[in-house]
Amino acid sequence: RVVLAMAASLAAGAATAADLEQVYRDALAYDAALASARASLEAGREKLPQGRAGLLPSLNLTGNSSWNDVNLKHYDVTRGYNNNGWQVQLTQPLFRWQNWVQYKQGEMQVALSEAQYQLARQDLTLRAAQGYFDVLVAQDVLAAATALHEANTQQLALGKKSFEVGTVTITDVHEAQSRADLSSAQMIAAESDLAVKRHALLVLTGKEPDALKGLRKGVALSRPEPADIQSWVASAETGSYAVQAAQIGREISDREVERNRSAHLPTVDLVASYGNAVGSTAAVSLSPIRTDTD
């Protein structure tokens, strides 16, 4: 939240604010961890209607149809007959404690998914700000290392000319050479570090970062209010998304124990049914088989 407030204040007046805000927006759209948390949030929200389904009435429709052929040996069958029937049954749960507990678990699952998603967004905000300022620091370090190397290179060139006219010793030239070599190595290390920090920002945002502008000079950050660490600790204990997620997870586990125990409780349902059955009779003409004998 502090980083978000800082980003908002920068967006209000500093030229770099757009850069920081853009990095954050790019990370929101690209970061895989946040995308996974967003998918988990959508899946968690489905737990509520799934749990509610156990409290709602259910309608069951059944039907049957059959045809029967009359087949009697030694007789002629004129036709068969059929039976048709259907039934509608409505069931409304009145007392199913297991379903009620499952519904409450669904509510908690939604709250847990929300807390985990907000925690992922908060983590992304910190990582985006960290990556942004890491690049700024690396740029400044490289600029300082480059300036130092240029100064040492000029001193080395001046020392060599002075040695030619005899105003300095060869030891002075060697020391100048050592300083130039050291500053060259520091500049190469700074270039490598900047490349690493820029790549980290690329992994976070999915975009190759351009040269980022530095902060305005003279930016004054206000002190946190209240300026009491204990107040912030107490606020974190109640408002932290990580703490909220842990508490909700514990409540879900407690409810799961209750749900398993309630499987042994009696259930009461209101059941209403209506049906109809129709059929035709078999009109069968039976004729004895005539046998002639000599």
Predicted regions: what is each one?
Residues 25-35, 42-57, 87-105, 115-122, ...:
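A glycine-/polar-enriched beta->alpha junction
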Residues 62-94, 215-226, 258, 271-294:
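Small/polar, glycine/serine/threonine/aspartate-rich low-complexity segments that form flexible
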Residues 15-64, 70, 92, 208-209, ...:
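Bacterial Sec-pathway N-terminal export signals of envelope proteins
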